Structure formats: C-alpha cells, structure tokens
C-alpha cells in the first residue's frame, strides 16, 4: 500500500518528537512476527548479486579508511591545540562512518562499540563503557576537554581498525545489503530528524546527508538489476531530499547546525524520506530476495 504524501506531512510533526521511536532502531530488535522464523545461518547470495556485493565491500573499506584518516587528523589538531579543526574532523569522520553505518550493524556488535549513545548506559556520560564517536563528541563539544578527546579517539581508532580487518575478510549477504538501503533512511527517520543523534555537536544534517548518500550508493550498485521504472522512481525520490539538504550546505560542503532546519523543511524531509524508505523496502520483492528466510516443517 502506497503512503499518501499529505497524510505523511500531517503525521510528521507528531512522530518526529516521539522519543520511543528513536530508541527502537538503536535497540537492534528485529521485527519477528509469528509467521517468521529466522534462518539459522546466512544463505549464499545468488551469482548475479556477487559483483554488487563485492563492489560495496570495497566501498565499505574505503569509507572506513576515510573515517580513520579523519580521526588521525583530529588527533593532530588536538596536539596542535586547534579545537575548531578537531571538531570539524570529528564531524567529517562521523559522516564517513554514517555512509555505511546501516551495513556495519550487520557485523555483530561493531556499531555498539563504535557509535553508542550515552543513553545506553545507566551512568550516561560518566559510564566507562561510554566510548566511540559520541564519547569524542562529548569531549569536544560539551566538555571542551582535549585530553579526554585524545583518549577517546585512540580507543575508537582501535575499534575502527578492527572493523577494517573484518571488512577485508567478511562479506554481506545480498538480502542484507538490500535491506541496508532501507535501514539507512530509517536511521534518519528514527533518530536524526528529531535531533536525537548528535546531542553535543548538533551536526545531524551532516549525518542525514551521509545516510542518504549511503542508501544511494547501494541503489546505484543495484541499478542494472532493477527495472527502468524503478530506477526512474528512485531517482526522483532521492531528488526531493537532496533539494532540501542543499539549502543547508555551504560552499565548502559543510552543513548547518540542526537548529537551522526549519519546521517546514523538517516535515518535508520526513514526508520525502518516508516515501523513499517505502520504495527501498519494495526492492527485496522486485529482486526476489528477502531479509528473513522462512523455514517451515523443520525437524
């Protein structure tokens, strides 16, 4: 059933402010209805998807390396006493990670150690398990503490290096790659548009752009396997959010703070991205693959 754009706009302001919705994605709980049985292992991807998956894994490696490079620049900026440069390097590093974040979630608990929020922990920012990107963000933007930022960055670099090694030797099933396009947009709808992602730097718009780009890269890889009509529809649906986001990007390619986003543009993004997410969710049917495999009459 197609979602009516007007209805989405009417509901947008209510859903964007719902805190429970923002936590649903973070919890990592799959929607497992009574008619679905999760497969005990990944089913090998059909041959036609393997070049697409291989290209995406190469891109994942490059994005991880780019995030690593920005974190190293962050360390150098801190050593030089340049907090402004360190903060910008953080925002760029998180952008590079968010492009692939929806797929990283597939790699076990990688995202939970690389990108946890303080809200995951009882002691919040004071909890020793609060590490990763948002620990650096807290040190840079809330505490203004270069030493804490250096320590958190060194810790994150170890986890980023571990992710790089996993990407080098592992792969994604085609079903999960396709799912990641939809999930990348859901990251925006569930946390970013409500301003719930970057609580200290307020750099949600940069991450929104990253998640849109992440979904686009998956779709671009799948384009030869999709119908001309689907490719045309998706092209138009990406153009809407792109036009809104362009209003908040400066000549250096940097995005404004979240608070600059007008209520009208926020609702427009919600409407456009909801329609895009619906179309991306339908790709599994067109490609004749699914995220959850059903096993019936299993002994």
Indicate residue ranges for each PLM-predicted region.
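Bacterial N-terminal signal peptides
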Residues: 8-17
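Mature extracytoplasmic or organellar-lumen-exposed domains after removal of signal/transit peptides
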Residues: 23-299
């Amino acid at each position: 059933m197609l979602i009516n754009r007007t209805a989405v706009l009417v509901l947008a302001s209510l859903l964007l402010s719902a805190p429970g919705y923002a936590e649903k994605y973070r919890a990592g709980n799959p929607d497992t209805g009574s008619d679905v049985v999760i497969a005990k292992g990944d089913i090998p991807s059909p041959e036609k998807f393997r070049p697409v998956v291989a290209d995406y894994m190469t891109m994942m490696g490059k994005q991880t390396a780019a995030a690593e490079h920005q974190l190293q620049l962050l360390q150098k900026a801190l050593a030089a006493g340049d907090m402004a440069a360190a903060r910008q390097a953080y925002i760029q590093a998180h952008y590079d990670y968010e492009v692939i974040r929806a797929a990283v979630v597939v790699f076990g608990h990688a995202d939970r150690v690389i990108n946890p929020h303080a809200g995951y922990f009882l002691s919040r920012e004071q909890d020793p398990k609060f590490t990763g990107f948002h620990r650096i963000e807290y040190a840079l933007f809330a505490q203004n503490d270069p030493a804490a930022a250096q320590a958190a960055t060194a810790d994150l670099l170890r986890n980023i290096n571990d992710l790089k090694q996993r990407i080098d030797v592992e792969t994604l099933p085609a079903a999960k790659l396709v799912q990641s396009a939809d999930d990348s947009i859901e990251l925006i709808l569930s946390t970013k548009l409500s301003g719930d992602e970057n609580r200290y730097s307020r750099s949600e718009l940069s991450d929104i752009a990253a998640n849109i780009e992440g979904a686009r890269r998956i779709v671009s890889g799948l384009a030869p396997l999709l119908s001309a009509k689907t490719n045309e529809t998706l092209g138009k649906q990406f153009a809407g959010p792109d036009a809104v986001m362009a209003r908040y990007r400066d000549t250096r390619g940097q995005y404004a703070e979240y608070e600059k986003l007008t209520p009208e543009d926020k609702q427009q993004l919600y409407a456009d991205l909801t329609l895009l997410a619906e179309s991306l969710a339908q790709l599994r049917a067109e490609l004749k693959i699914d995220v959850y495999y059903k096993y019936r009459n299993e002994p």
